[in-house]
Amino acid sequence: MFIVSGSTMPSPFLNNVLDDLQAKSADIVLAALIASDGMVVASSLPDHQNRERIGTIAAAILALGARATHELDCGKLQQMMVGGKHGNLLIMPAGPETMLVTAIRINANLDFVIKDVSRAAQEAERLLC
């Protein structure tokens, strides 16, 4: 179930982006569209997850990544990967004020997942702009 909050975008459009993304890849465990201020716009986060906390953490991670790429003259941030023992987070900008955060399985084929997440981020950006 996807939740849309604080957005003027009708929920079915954003829900479809997240639904389609997870349908394309069994390696994507969850997905969320999060505004740069940390507000969760749409997500497949389980009910036991603290959406506010996840949003705040994701916004901080993206801000740090953007700052690091700028300071190190790497250009505009395109994606961030945070690796964990049991899975990875892949974060991509989905417009100037939104990011697509995905949790992916540890043994996922990253080439395919990155392409799918990139397409979904572009579609979300198109819908949000």
What are these regions (language model features)?
Residues 1-129:
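Non-catalytic interaction/Regulatory regions outside core domains
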